[in-house]
Regions:
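A glycine- and charged-residue-rich anion-binding loop/surface
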Residues: 45-311
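Acidic/proline-rich low-complexity IDRs
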Residues: 14-22, 36, 51, 66
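Short, positively charged and aromatic/hydrophobic N-terminal segments
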Residues: 2-5, 23-38
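Acidic, Ala/Val/Gly-enriched low-complexity intrinsically disordered segments
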Residues: 9-16, 20, 27, 40-43
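Intrinsic disorder/low-structure terminal segments
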Residues: 17, 24, 34-37, 84, ...
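Intrinsically disordered, low-complexity N-terminal regions enriched in serine/proline/glycine
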Residues: 2, 10-11, 25, 52
Length: 311
């Protein structure tokens, strides 16, 4: 029934009655339906999320207001006025953690709005606490800054571009636009770790267009709008949307574990930080075991195996 069809009352009274009926409908529907109505009203013109992970990469706990919450595939898509959860992008996976007591399963960004996929509904308008998984965040920062160090060195020494980058669950792959020998990669690895030991700062800036035009920086594609520039020591200047450590020493170490020809260039697999350390521990334990079986010193096991093969 439309309020204009009611007879015997003024137009103002009709409108007031209609609003009362509408309010009564709204307060009696389920919380999830209310969320849906809120989203339908807010989707057009929702303000960009304030990105706390850009303001402070070490921020792991924050409070923010829930702007929307919509059911999606058995979970809930939540937006906030601000967030420290990094969304997947630029080769870097999304953060994980907890939001208002619900687990954060995924985070992505669309048109400047960061959307969190969580396991339980959150009430619109409520202030909630977010807790980012710090171990995962540090791991991703170590891998990403380590990649910048290696890519910067390769670009400076050989002129090759980084044309592909991905942080996987086990390792990191970087695709370079030209061939690299094992000896060249060994030199790159040594130089990369030297940069880490110098512990130079990692700086982040948003240059004005006039400054950007004068800046020599790496970028995989043409960019528009505000450009975020990450400078790693004196080895790399790159347009980047990812999270990074504050100083190179926090990367810990870099190990290039393998390389193969790929699309006319070279795909390098690498490990940084805790991943490099854990890989070293596993391989050292295996080397110790082989050393014991061969009754040979750990750095002489290859020669011992060769003697066995020659017998």
């Amino acid at each position: 029934m439309h309020y204009s069809t009611i007879s015997g009352v003024s137009d103002n009274e009709k409108l007031a009655l209609f609003l009362v009926l509408l309010l009564n409908f709204y307060v009696t529907i389920s919380p999830i339906s209310k969320i849906g109505l809120f989203i339908e009203r807010k989707e057009n013109g929702m303000a960009e999320t304030r990105k706390l992970y850009y303001e402070n990469g070490a921020c792991l706990q924050f409070c923010a207001t829930v702007l929307s919450c919509v059911p999606t595939d058995g979970n809930f898509a939540v937006t906030l006025d601000a967030t420290a959860f990094y969304p997947e992008g630029g080769g870097q996976p999304a953060d994980r953690g907890a939001l208002g007591g619900a687990r954060v399963l995924d985070v992505h960004e669309k048109d400047g709005v960061v959307v969190h996929t969580v396991t339980a509904p959150l009430r619109v308008g409520e202030m909630v606490q977010g807790d980012v998984d710090g171990r995962r965040r540090l791991d991703h920062m170590q891998q990403h800054t380590g990649e910048h160090i290696v890519s910067g060195i390769v670009h400076a020494q050989f002129g090759y571009d980084n044309v592909g980058f991905h942080i996987g669950a086990q390792d990191v792959t970087v695709d370079f636009s030209g061939p690299l020998t094992d000896a060249e990669l060994a030199d790159v690895e040594r130089a990369a770790n030297w940069v880490i030991w110098q512990n130079a700062p990692v700086t982040i800036a948003w240059p004005a267009p006039s400054e950007l035009a004068q800046l020599n920086y790496r970028s995989k594609k043409e960019l528009t709008g505000a450009i975020r520039i990450v400078t790693v020591a004196n080895v790399d200047v790159c347009a980047c949307c990812g999270t990074h450590v504050e100083r190179c020493g926090q990367v810990g170490s870099i190990k290039l574990t393998s390389a193969q020809s790929y699309k006319g260039g070279t795909r390098v697999t690498m490990l940084c930080g805790m991943r490099a350390y854990e890989d070293h521990c596993i391989k050292f334990q295996n080397a110790e075991a082989v050393s014991g079986l061969l009754s040979a010193k750990i750095n002489e096991t290859a020669a011992a195996v060769q003697r066995l093969a020659d017998e």
